[in-house]
């Protein structure tokens, strides 16, 4: 299973639906996050003026067994195509941001479902980890 930044932010922030996301992570034998999404997650936590939480990101990923995966050339191409087709400014209702395209790409290249929060990915052809 591929994990988008939005899923971890929802868990840390205690958003509605966070329990479902936690349970999906606990059930998953192999969870991965794209390296740019890891950076995005750290930046979001830091921006929220909660440095204590930003320091816990690595521990949280370890607790859930989420591996950070480097971006390869295939993923980069798929991410670029996703931004073209689904990105902000494309006119598509998904309105993916740049970080979203890396989660999308890793899920597409690996064929794994994507764990996310929100409705942006529901407007794409990605397979969700939770319905």
Swiss-Prot record:
<comment type="similarity">
    <text>Belongs to the PINc/VapC protein family.</text>
</comment>
<keyword id="KW-0479">Metal-binding</keyword>
<feature type="binding site">
    <location>
        <position position="100"/>
    </location>
    <ligand>
        <name>Mg(2+)</name>
    </ligand>
</feature>
<dbReference type="GO" id="GO:0000287">
    <property type="term" value="F:magnesium ion binding"/>
</dbReference>
<keyword id="KW-0460">Magnesium</keyword>
<dbReference type="Pfam" id="PF01850">
    <property type="entry name" value="PIN"/>
</dbReference>
<dbReference type="InterPro" id="IPR050556">
    <property type="entry name" value="Type_II_TA_system_RNase"/>
</dbReference>
<feature type="domain" description="PINc">
    <location>
        <begin position="1"/>
        <end position="125"/>
    </location>
</feature>
<dbReference type="InterPro" id="IPR029060">
    <property type="entry name" value="PIN-like_dom_sf"/>
</dbReference>
<dbReference type="InterPro" id="IPR022907">
    <property type="entry name" value="VapC_family"/>
</dbReference>
<dbReference type="InterPro" id="IPR002716">
    <property type="entry name" value="PIN_dom"/>
</dbReference>
<keyword id="KW-0540">Nuclease</keyword>
<keyword id="KW-0378">Hydrolase</keyword>
<dbReference type="GO" id="GO:0004540">
    <property type="term" value="F:RNA nuclease activity"/>
</dbReference>
<comment type="function">
    <text>Toxic component of a type II toxin-antitoxin (TA) system. An RNase.</text>
</comment>
<keyword id="KW-1277">Toxin-antitoxin system</keyword>
<feature type="binding site">
    <location>
        <position position="4"/>
    </location>
    <ligand>
        <name>Mg(2+)</name>
    </ligand>
</feature>
<protein>
    <recommendedName>
        <fullName>VapC ribonuclease Mb2780c</fullName>
        <ecNumber>3.1.-.-</ecNumber>
    </recommendedName>
</protein>
């Amino acid at each position: 299973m591929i994990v988008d930044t939005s899923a971890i932010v929802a868990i840390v922030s205690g958003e509605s639906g966070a329990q479902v996301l936690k349970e999906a992570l606990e059930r998953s034998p192999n969870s991965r996050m794209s390296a740019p999404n890891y950076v995005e997650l750290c930046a979001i936590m830091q921006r929220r003026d909660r440095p204590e939480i930003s320091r816990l990101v690595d521990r949280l990923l370890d607790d859930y067994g989420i591996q950070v995966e480097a971006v390869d050339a295939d993923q980069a191409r798929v991410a670029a195509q996703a931004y073209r087709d689904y990105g902000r400014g494309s006119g598509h209702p998904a309105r993916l941001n740049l970080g979203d395209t890396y989660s999308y790409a890793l899920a597409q290249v690996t064929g794994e479902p994507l764990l996310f929060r929100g409705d942006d990915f529901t407007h794409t052809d990605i397979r969700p980890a939770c319905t």
